[in-house]
């Protein structure tokens, strides 16, 4: 885990910006499930030379609506402008950004370690229990363990297993839920209620096309 990220968990975003550091933000984007949208969103970040630390896509509680969960380290001003730019994309319904304190989030990690090391060393088994790891595949030559938690927790288990010949490691992107959100279903109903209705409205300019559109 990088030192700047360790510090980012101990100070508020405004404090980090004052000392010249970029705080971590989680951007949640609600979209329609359309081909090519991921590429268009990625271009927004690449054009601004902003590195994406984590990216996850998944369905939501609303049928046909998907969500992107994007983690970056940037100033709030930059993140706010990014969300506005993302919302201009066709098929994007809404974009939100939150600090770590405003979300509930987790990451999953898989660890492949030699089975002999686990069987012969009680300390390894104790380590795995401490981190809440569970076996998902057990073979003669290796065992795969899975654990879920925050970045510092999954990183901690990596360092703990390295002396025992860890073969492979992989971590998922972040998944997150906004604490104060009532869900996108309620937001969608609000948008629908404010959408244009079928009622005809008289417009005084409709019958004056030549006057209105002539310079």
Predicted features along the sequence, with ranges:
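Long, contiguous binding/interaction regions
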Residues: 2-66, 71-215
């Amino acid at each position: 885990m990088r030192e700047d990220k360790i510090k980012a968990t101990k100070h508020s975003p405004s404090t980090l910006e004052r000392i010249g550091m970029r705080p971590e933000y989680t951007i949640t984007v609600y979209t329609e499930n359309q081909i090519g949208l991921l590429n268009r969103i990625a271009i927004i970040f690449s054009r601004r030379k902003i590195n994406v630390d984590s990216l996850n896509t998944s369905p939501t509680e609303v049928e046909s609506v998907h969500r992107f969960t994007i983690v970056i380290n940037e100033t709030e001003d930059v993140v706010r402008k990014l969300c506005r730019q993302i919302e201009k994309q066709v098929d994007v319904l809404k974009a939100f950004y939150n600090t770590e304190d405003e979300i509930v989030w987790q990451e999953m990690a898989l660890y492949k370690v030699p089975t002999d090391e686990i069987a012969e060393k009680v300390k390894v088994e104790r380590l795995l229990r401490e981190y809440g790891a569970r076996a998902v595949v057990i073979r003669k030559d290796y065992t795969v363990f899975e654990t879920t938690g925050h970045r510092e927790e999954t990183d901690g288990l990596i360092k703990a297993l390295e002396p025992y010949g860890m073969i492979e490691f992989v971590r998922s992107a972040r998944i997150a839920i906004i604490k104060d959100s009532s869900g996108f279903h309620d937001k969608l109903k609000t948008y629908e209620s404010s959408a244009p209705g079928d009622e005809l409205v008289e417009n005084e300019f409709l019958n004056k096309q030549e006057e209105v559109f002539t310079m």
